[in-house]
């Protein structure tokens, strides 16, 4: 008899709960008779809020506690933002599905300025991401970029309190939480190449639980999976965590994929860009090829310097 009850491990931020609830509703609609329960957990990344993420260090800051709950049998599956999911999974766990992607772009949010280019010289911009900091600094070295941690609501509150002239967030999180109206400008990939997997949701599960795997398999989106697989393969070859100045963005037209990648120093002084094109069927190979091209340009030295500063 198939499973009648499923427990989803989730972080407890508003966005994480929205994402888990979204998966719950989709699963219950797909499988009449199935009940789904949420298990809210607190992760290391949620607790350490006074330190820039890159300095907290380690991979999987937002997933480890969820993985432990699955391995201990307290939860059956976990819902993650794909950009937070490490490349390596603990023994016994794996990715069961990647859902259809919301926009992967970054959003410019400000109460005073309509666009990034309108920011005056020396304006204060908040972001938690070395990837965004790198690209912003390259484009606008005059800007003062400060670390901004906390969930979406907290970050918006800090902007509204006047701590920043503008902040940069993932557009997907704002849209999912009903804050589309706060987006003044969606930054193009030319201005801010997105994080690997940004905007996509992934479901992690136990590999020895074929019933749960069968239930979530129907949520898999083939195009998103191919795009994210290419981006993650690039990240994997570069040995990137989720807190490094690496960007990757795949687009699909017909059966062809274009994959763009970026590695840069956080201060924007050195930024390497490259891209590859090829068949969608070779998504992971394209990611590895792009990483090799970036490494040939010197990406390894840039990343070593970053890891050295934040180890």
Swiss-Prot record:
Q: What is its EC number?
A: 2.5.1.61
Q: What superkingdom heads the lineage?
A: Bacteria
Residues modified as S-(dipyrrolylmethanemethyl)cysteine: 242
What broad class of enzyme is this?
A: transferase
Q: Which cofactor does it need?
A: dipyrromethane
Gene3D superfamilies this protein is in?
Answer: Periplasmic binding protein-like II, Porphobilinogen deaminase, C-terminal domain
Q: Which reaction does it catalyse?
A: 4 porphobilinogen + H2O = hydroxymethylbilane + 4 NH4(+)
Task: Name one cellular component (GO) term.
Answer: cytoplasm
Supply the SUPFAM superfamilies for this chain: Periplasmic binding protein-like II, Porphobilinogen deaminase (hydroxymethylbilane synthase), C-terminal domain
Gene Ontology biological process = protoporphyrinogen IX biosynthetic process
- Cofactor, how bound (note): Binds 1 dipyrromethane group covalently.
Q: Which GO molecular function annotations are given, in alphabetical order?
A: hydroxymethylbilane synthase activity
Q: Which UniProt keywords apply?
A: Porphyrin biosynthesis, Transferase
Q: Pfam families in the record, alphabetically? A: Porphobil_deam, Porphobil_deamC
Its pathway, per UniProt, is: Porphyrin-containing compound metabolism; protoporphyrin-IX biosynthesis; coproporphyrinogen-III from 5-aminolevulinate: step 2/4
Query: What functional role does this protein have?
Result: Tetrapolymerization of the monopyrrole PBG into the hydroxymethylbilane pre-uroporphyrinogen in several discrete steps.
Subunit info? Monomer.
Entries under PANTHER family matching the protein: PORPHOBILINOGEN DEAMINASE (PTHR11557:SF0)
Q: Beyond the main fields, what else does the record say?
A: The porphobilinogen subunits are added to the dipyrromethane group.
- Family the UniProt entry places it in: Belongs to the HMBS family.
**Name of the protein in its database record:** Porphobilinogen deaminase
Q: Which organism is it from?
A: Hahella chejuensis (strain KCTC 2396)
Question: Which gene carries the instructions for this protein?
Answer: hemC
């Amino acid at each position: 008899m198939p499973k009648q009850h499923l427990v989803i491990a989730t972080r407890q931020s508003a966005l994480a709960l929205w994402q888990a609830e979204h998966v719950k509703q989709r699963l219950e609609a797909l499988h009449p008779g199935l009940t789904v329960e949420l298990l809210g957990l607190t992760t290391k990344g949620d607790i350490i809020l006074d330190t820039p993420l890159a300095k907290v260090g380690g991979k999987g800051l937002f997933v480890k506690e969820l993985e432990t709950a699955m391995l201990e049998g307290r939860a059956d599956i976990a819902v993650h933002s794909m950009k937070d999911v490490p490349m390596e999974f603990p023994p016994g766990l794996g990715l069961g599905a990647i859902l259809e992607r919301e926009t992967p772009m970054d959003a410019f949010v400000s109460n005073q300025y309509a666009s990034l280019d309108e920011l005056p010289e020396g304006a204060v911009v908040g972001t938690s991401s070395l990837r965004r900091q790198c690209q912003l600094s390259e484009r606008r070295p005059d800007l003062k970029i400060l670390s901004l941690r906390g969930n979406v609501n907290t970050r918006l509150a800090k902007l509204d309190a006047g701590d920043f002239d503008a902040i940069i967030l993932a557009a997907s999180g704002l849209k999912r939480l009903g804050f589309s109206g706060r987006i003044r400008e969606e930054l193009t990939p030319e201005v801010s190449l997105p994080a690997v997997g940004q905007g996509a949701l992934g479901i992690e599960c136990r590999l020895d639980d074929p019933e749960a795997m069968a239930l979530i398999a129907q949520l898999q989106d083939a195009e998103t999976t191919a795009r994210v697989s290419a981006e993650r393969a690039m990240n994997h070859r570069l040995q990137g965590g989720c807190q490094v100045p690496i960007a990757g963005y795949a687009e699909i037209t017909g059966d062809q994929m274009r994959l763009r990648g970026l590695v840069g120093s956080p201060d924007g002084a050195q930024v390497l860009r490259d891209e590859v094109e090829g068949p969608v069927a070779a998504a992971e190979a394209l990611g590895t090829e792009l990483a090799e091209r970036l490494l040939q340009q010197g990406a390894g030295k840039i990343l070593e310097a970053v890891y050295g500063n934040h180890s």
